[in-house]
Each structure stands twice: as C-alpha cells, then as structure tokens.
Amino acid sequence: PKSIRELSSLFENDCIFINRQRGSGTRLFLDFKLGELGVSGDQIRGYQNEEYTHWAVAASVSSGYADVGIGIKAAAVSNGLEFIPLGQEKYQLVVPESQMENNSGIPKLLALLDSSVLKNRIEQLGGYDVSMMGASMKIGDNIN
C-alpha cells in the first residue's frame, strides 16, 4: 500500500518502519546500506522502534504497528507478508582442524548439515541457499 519497493522507499514514502536492535546483523546491514545512500536513520520514521527477532519485526508489520521492516524471508512468509530481497548473507561454521579429528561430534554435525532431510526442511522455509551446506573446506578456499 505504501509503494515500498527498495531501501530508498523508507525515507521517500510516509511509512512507519520497525527496526532490529542495535548490534544485530540486520541493523548493521541496514546502517551500512543507508550510509551508501548518504542517509541517516533519523530520516526514517520509526527507525528508533526496535524488535529483537525477525519474527517480531514481521509480527509488528502484520499487526499494523509498522508498515515495513527488514528481516528474513521465512519470517515474512510465515506472517503472510510480501518479501523484497535487499541482499544475501553467507555463513560458515569455522572449526579448528584439530577438532575435526579429535571431536566425534563435529563429523556428526557436518553429516547432519549435509543431509538431504535437513536441507529440504530449510529450503521449505524459503530464502535459503543450501547448496554448500555441510561442505567442508579449508580457510583460504574459495567460499563464494
């Protein structure tokens, strides 16, 4: 309803924003992107309103408390909201090589992460690329 299509819509339209808490990855991402646009959070109505989870942000929007917030696709979909991607994040689990050999739990964890059952469940949430999930690599390998 507010014609929100991209990040600049947050300060160009009369919309109420719900933010993530200071220090969260989502908040750091937003602040970085705003800096690239030369915009301050003070220019966004509701920037000071904070929630602590992606689902709380989505609930704030679906309840009408806010018009827009930034979060993950799974939270948006589970609350019946439209999702507009702003970027992608990659995560790696880093384990010392000695633990790979001396800790039986690590290979079990990697086997679980590489299992088709878990990958399928995560894909069903929406918004996740599981193609490299469970893959083992050494630091310095290309992880793009």
Per-region residue spans from a language model:
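Periplasmic-binding protein-like
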Residues: 81-111, 130-138
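N-terminal hydrophobic or amphipathic helices and topogenic motifs
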Residues: 2-8, 14-16, 116-144
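A ligand-binding cleft/hinge motif common to bilobed small-molecule-binding domains
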Residues: 58-88
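Short helix-loop capping/hinge motifs at secondary-structure junctions, enriched
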Residues: 1-5, 39, 98-104
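Short loop->beta-strand "edge-of-pocket" segments that line small-molecule binding or catalytic clefts
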Residues: 7-30
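Small-molecule pocket liners
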Residues: 1, 15, 89-93
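Short beta-strand-to-loop elements that line the ligand-binding cleft
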Residues: 41-53
